Structure formats: C-alpha cells, structure tokens
Amino acid sequence: MRCPFCEYNGTRVLDSRPFNHNKSIRRRRECEACERRFTTFEMVEETPLLIVKKDGTREEFSRDKILRGLVRACEKRPVPLEVLENVVNDIEKELRSCGQAEIPSNDVGEKVMERLYHVDEVAYVRFASVYRQFKDINVFMKELEELLAQARNSSFPKE
C-alpha cells in the first residue's frame, strides 16, 4: 500500500481488527520509509442493486431515499431514528440476500410497508397513502378498515 505522506509503496500492518459489525477491517499501518502511521479500512465491494421503477427506468438502490420516506411518514410520531435506520438496514440486507441485481420498486415499497406496519400504525397509513396513491377518502377508509381487521388478526395486510 502506498503511504499517503511520502508516496512510498511499502507499509507494515501494526494492528488489524474488525470494524462496523464485522463488515470491514480497520488496519493501522506504518510506512517503511518515513515511519508515519495511518489507518486504512478494507471492505467487500458490493455489486450495485438496481431498482426497476414502474415506468421501466432503473436507478441505483438508495438507503437515503427509503430513510427520508420513513422519516416523513413518522413525523411527529414517537419513533426513534435508530428504529428507522434498523428498518432500512433490514430491507437492504433482505434485498441483497435475494441474489437479484434488479429489484422491482413495488417489492421495495411492500417491504417498507410491512416493516412500518410493525413500527407505527399511523406512520404505516401515512406511507401507504402516498405509496399506494389513494385517490379519495373511500380508498383511504378502506385501508384503515383493513388495518383494523389485520390488527385483530395480527398479520400484515396485502394488496
């Protein structure tokens, strides 16, 4: 590895330890020429996940986009940001583990709704109203009635 201080192409690893929940390795290095120390991180390069939108266009998976939607749905609700970040982590982990490079956007939306339903029901209805594009109050009321019925049966509603 090239030293960031003197550009010499020789370093020693002094310390190596897992980092970020074993997703990467933090290494403390020392340059063999100038003897200055620096830190590097090594992690697996993940292949990009592409989301196929309803109109057929593709865009790279964005954790931030999902988190923004969750935060907006949970505005003025007692839901800690950490819970929402865990939801995003779970969704990304599930999407990456399915082995597909391209995921339909409606699959992502349904995964978000499924998890949000268990986090906060009001936030779930808010998210659903935007995601499913409720056209009028009757559709909105129908979703609320399904939510109440599902709460009695304690399972996640499907379209």
From Swiss-Prot:
InterPro entries on file: ATP-cone_dom, NrdR-like_N, RNR_NrdR-like
Annotated ranges, domain ATP-cone: 49-139
Cofactor: Zn(2+)
Positions in coiled-coil regions: none
A biological process term (GO) from this entry: negative regulation of DNA-templated transcription
Family, per entry: Belongs to the NrdR family.
Protein name per Swiss-Prot or TrEMBL: Transcriptional repressor NrdR
Organism listed in the record: Brevibacillus brevis (strain 47 / JCM 6285 / NBRC 100599)
